[in-house]
Amino acid sequence: MNYTPNPIDTSAVSLESELMQLVEYMAKNNHDVWAKERIAQGWKYGPCRRDDLKEHPCLVPYELLPEEEKIYDRNSAMETLKAVCALGYTILPSPDTK
């Protein structure tokens, strides 16, 4: 199989500073979705990753993740929001969040 990834070009998109809280919410949610899926597959917390025992050190609340893992989740969230903007959508907070 010959596969060439072709992601949406987000290089010209910069997110407003007001969206950084949304980035953090989305990063936490991404982690929670990932963790819930792993737990449903029988994985549990372990101090180091052991695929044979289904143990993973990141099966902890987002707040307890090492900073490099949080950065990974934040970057994923930022790229998603930037792709939404690059596709011509506008992200606005609901009136309840102001």
Where are these regions (language model features)?
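Alpha-helical propensity feature that highlights long, continuous alpha-helices across diverse contexts
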Residues: 1-98
